[in-house]
Amino acid sequence: MADILLLDNIDSFTWNLADQLRTNGHNVVIYRNHIPAQTLIDRLATMKNPVLMLSPGPGVPSEAGCMPELLTRLRGKLPIIGICLGHQAIVEAYGGYVGQAGEILHGKASSIEHDGQAMFAGLANPLPVARYHSLVGSNVPAGLTINAHFNGMVMAVRHDADRVCGFQFHPESILTTQGARLLEQTLAWAQQKLEPTNTLQPILEKLYQAQTLTQQESHQLFSAVVRGELKPEQLAAALVSMKIRGEHPNEIAGAATALLENAAPFPRPEYLFADIVGTGGDGSNSINISTASAFVAAACGLKVAKHGNRSVSSKSGSSDLLAAFGINLDMNADKSRQALDELGVCFLFAPKYHTGLRHAMPVRQQLKTRTLFNVLGPLINPAHPPLALIGVYSPELVLPIAETLRVLGYQRAAVVHSGGMDEVSLHAPTIVAELHDGEIKSYQLTAEDFGLTPYHQDQLAGGTPEENRDILTRLLQGKGDAAHEAAVAANVAMLMRLHGQEDLKANAQTVLDVLRNGTAYDRVTALAARG
């Protein structure tokens, strides 16, 4: 018998579900999703065999009251079962995407195929189920097992270690012919005690033998890192082993999905938006080109959710510059999303969303060398943008990072390096690996491709955050140096291409026109005014 806290996402199916569970002898208490998350966490703490169940409901997961916060705080600590909207929330919480299913289903019977494992053991296959949904989960991260599907759509997921699972369909419906049995087997699975095993040691041994990890193994390793479960000497050995051999795209993707799953949630928009970001570490100490480009892109009508951190190797990282502009780095997720909606730009401060990285910081500081963590920053944007322009500090990283973006499910992205800089530049050819609908194309770009004049790298030199603020203030007000204008124009033009505007020369001219009318600076002051 389970003690179930059923979170009601304001849906009549909640009561059908409660009746089914109570018929089978389970204790069920129901709370609506407008109750503070802490109140529900305190209530769960009083239960003997607690299970959190997330009901169906209208709308999208990010708007379902306290549900996203509950998932962030409780996954891995107690069993969680999600149904329909609850299932979608689980997919999002672990780093997946929820979007339109292509049709609106209301009481439709479908026969899904499943893996016959765990909660589906012994059930009919295909299994008739009831579907009531217009959204569906996709880009499911490696940490979740897809254990049921219908015509390529995800119908169920589970996380064995965390004892978290979700069903896109309704097991409590009469149209789900074996729904009662499925619920019982799910609760039995959820309450099983995992035998403690040292599952990380075989993974570490593979690294010591210079073998490449699978995406799942890398995911497992870095999940342990962000939970603080790895000893410093183990983490140091793992990072150095991968560095010497060279990190594989599947290893980078596994680490990225682990960090995304453990990140604080951000209400992901359904409209098209992008990130423009560099790894840093190129040693150029240039002005903050990608940060300036984000504001200019917004003034050009694009939407940019920029993920960034303080400086590691330069005098001024993106967050250092933003702080100098008076922009609040601790802006909460809802306010940041509102800024993205209304201004076309927001900034997500990495330490606010990825608190688990604190466990790796002492080791990184002691090693004093680049490791896999140096390339993870651009890949772990908690907003999960479908588009990205990513600069890398080494030409050897261009193709591997593009391959990683493909594994992570990006819709379209470009990875670039140019003459020692982690962005598109005009002083040297820009090496590009462009991902578009699963295909990667490699090519080079020069200043001529943008219709711009080449400039020397020295003309992009920056300084302290305050010095860079003053430089970019002039630039965004339409009073900047020609070299600075051209650098931003090239990068925003490339970002516009990722949005389907293929003509780089026309794009660059549009950017220059916007730069010179000063409207980009209005985005800076408006964002700073939001506090």
From Swiss-Prot:
Keyword Repeat annotated: no
PROSITE patterns named among the record's database cross-references: GATASE_TYPE_1
InterPro entries: Anthranilate_Pribosyl_Tfrase, Class_I_gatase-like, GATASE, Glycosyl_Trfase_fam3, Glycosyl_Trfase_fam3_N_dom, Glycosyl_Trfase_fam3_N_dom_sf, Nuc_phospho_transferase, TrpG/PapA_dom
Catalysed reactions listed for this entry: chorismate + L-glutamine = anthranilate + pyruvate + L-glutamate + H(+); N-(5-phospho-beta-D-ribosyl)anthranilate + diphosphate = 5-phospho-alpha-D-ribose 1-diphosphate + anthranilate
Entry keyword annotation includes Amino-acid biosynthesis: yes
Biological or metabolic pathway of the protein: Amino-acid biosynthesis; L-tryptophan biosynthesis; L-tryptophan from chorismate: step 1/5; Amino-acid biosynthesis; L-tryptophan biosynthesis; L-tryptophan from chorismate: step 2/5
Gene3D superfamilies: 3.40.50.880, Nucleoside phosphorylase/phosphoribosyltransferase catalytic domain, Transferase, Pyrimidine Nucleoside Phosphorylase, Chain C
Annotated signal peptide: none
GO molecular function: anthranilate phosphoribosyltransferase activity; anthranilate synthase activity; magnesium ion binding
Regulation: Cooperatively feedback inhibited by tryptophan.
Ranges for region Anthranilate phosphoribosyltransferase: 202-531
EC number: 4.1.3.27, 2.4.2.18
Sorted UniProt keywords: Allosteric enzyme, Amino-acid biosynthesis, Aromatic amino acid biosynthesis, Glutamine amidotransferase, Glycosyltransferase, Lyase, Multifunctional enzyme, Transferase, Tryptophan biosynthesis
Binding site for L-glutamine: G57, P58, G59, Q88, S134, L135
Domain Glutamine amidotransferase type-1: 3-196
Entry's Gene Ontology BP terms: L-tryptophan biosynthetic process; phenazine biosynthetic process
Catalytic residues as annotated in Swiss-Prot or TrEMBL: C84 (nucleophile), H170 (for gatase activity), E172 (for gatase activity)
Subunit structure: Monomer. Heterotetramer consisting of two non-identical subunits: a beta subunit (TrpG) and a large alpha subunit (TrpE).
Protein function: Part of a heterotetrameric complex that catalyzes the two-step biosynthesis of anthranilate, an intermediate in the biosynthesis of L-tryptophan. In the first step, the glutamine-binding beta subunit (TrpG) of anthranilate synthase (AS) provides the glutamine amidotransferase activity which generates ammonia as a substrate that, along with chorismate, is used in the second step, catalyzed by the large alpha subunit of AS (TrpE) to produce anthranilate. In the absence of TrpG, TrpE can synthesize anthranilate directly from chorismate and high concentrations of ammonia.
Similarity comment text for this entry: In the C-terminal section; belongs to the anthranilate phosphoribosyltransferase family.
Protein name: Bifunctional protein TrpGD
Source organism (scientific name): Salmonella typhimurium (strain LT2 / SGSC1412 / ATCC 700720)
Gene assigned in the entry: trpGD
